[in-house]
């Protein structure tokens, strides 16, 4: 496990870009952290690092935002998903099978289902208005 401290949104995005270079195709990233912690900002960096050019936004209402690029990213918000059937209907496993990088916010809601996929775990804690403590397990950045 590695811990990083970022002092701005830009530094959080940069860490996401750096992680993107380390990810194998079909990687699953399981995010935890409170509202406004910076999960979507981190995913913005992931998307940039994967070569996706569309603007990144929170998938809260859409459940999943898919970003095309040389290495595609499927960005899920699992907060409102309540069953495994809902997870499957949203295309979660299809994206993994296609080799997309899958970033799942609120992954703690499905920890048991995600465990067989051997996810990379990222927790983001809000220290203050600009500072974040980011812990990453499962890959070195």
Which stretches of residues belong to each language-model region?
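N-terminal pre-Walker A segment at the start of P-loop NTPase domains
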Residues: 1-18
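Short phosphate-coordinating micro-motif centered on Lys-Gly-acidic
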Residues: 2-3, 48, 82-85, 93-141
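Phosphate-binding P-loop
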Residues: 20-26
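Short hydrophobic/aromatic beta-strand immediately N-terminal to the Walker A/P-loop
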Residues: 28-30
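P-loop (Walker A) phosphate-binding loop of NTP-binding proteins
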Residues: 32-34
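Conserved lysine of the Walker
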Residues: 39
